[in-house]
Curated annotation (Swiss-Prot):
Protein name, entry field: Small ribosomal subunit protein uS3
Disulfide bonds listed in the record: none
Assembly behavior: Part of the 30S ribosomal subunit. Forms a tight complex with proteins S10 and S14.
Source species: Hahella chejuensis (strain KCTC 2396)
Keywords: Ribonucleoprotein, Ribosomal protein, RNA-binding, rRNA-binding
Gene Ontology terms, MF aspect: mRNA binding; rRNA binding; structural constituent of ribosome
């Protein structure tokens, strides 16, 4: 049977950029990688209620720059920026270098695969019927302008004895088209019956200019936000 490759991994360098942006020699590479994993795990746990989608880690010489993409920046920043200062200290201790933290707001959380997946998982944990949770998420994404979306849940659905997989799709989700901008994420729902896996694919359109276009758009967005 044909197997599905990770849609983000296969598009790296084509229409997707890496979440860790640094270069290291053989001696330091594994340490940097392990630190990145620890930092991401720490931030995801600490900012559980802040709807964090992804954490981008850059390592200029002698310091580190972390960009947190979140749908609720107020929770990350805290009162008068107290929380983000504390966060900077804690992450600095983990990375053993001075850390600069940027917060980027996700304006359309219904078009972010990670947030959609965690939203569906949260509903499953609150015992919402899985079909209703999937349908609601799909409708919200299509309303926000997605070209296509597919949601898949797998496990003991509705407390069934035998685990199974169900999915729901609307619009186009062209996994073989490498220029297609497909956001993919997974999440786990921990229910009384066991773990239910949630997978989300969101197709946002085609990027004809390749990775250069993606980077140029990111740069323009950064300039706009810094003004």
């Amino acid at each position: 049977m044909g197997q599905k490759v990770n849609p983000v991994g296969i598009r790296l360098g084509i229409v997707k950029d890496h979440n860790s942006v640094w270069y290291a020699d053989k001696k330091n590479y594994s340490d940097h990688l392990l630190t990145d994993i620890k930092v991401r795990e720490f931030l995801m746990k600490k900012l559980e209620k802040a709807s964090v989608s992804k954490v981008i880690i850059e390592r200029p010489p002698q310091n580190a720059k972390i960009t947190i993409h979140t749908a609720r920046p107020g929770i990350v920043i805290g009162k008068k920026g107290e929380d983000v200062d504390r966060l900077r200290q804690e992450v600095g201790e983990l990375m053993k270098v001075p850390v600069h933290i940027n917060i980027e707001e996700i304006r359309k959380p219904d078009l972010d695969a990670k947030l959609v997946a965690s939203g569906v998982a949260g509903q499953l944990e609150r015992r919402v019927m899985f079909r209703r949770a999937m349908k609601r998420a799909v409708q919200n994404a299509m309303r926000q302008g997605a070209k296509g979306i597919k949601i898949q849940v797998g496990g003991r659905l509705g407390g069934a004895e035998i685990a199974r997989t169900e999915w729901y799709r609307e619009g186009r989700v062209p996994l073989h088209t490498l220029r297609a901008d497909i956001d993919y994420a997974t999440h786990e729902a921990h229910t009384t019956y066991g773990v239910i896996g949630v997978k989300v694919w969101i197709f946002k359109g085609e990027i004809l200019g390749g990775i250069e276009q993606v980077r140029a758009e990111k740069k323009a967005a950064k300039k706009k936000s810094s003004k």
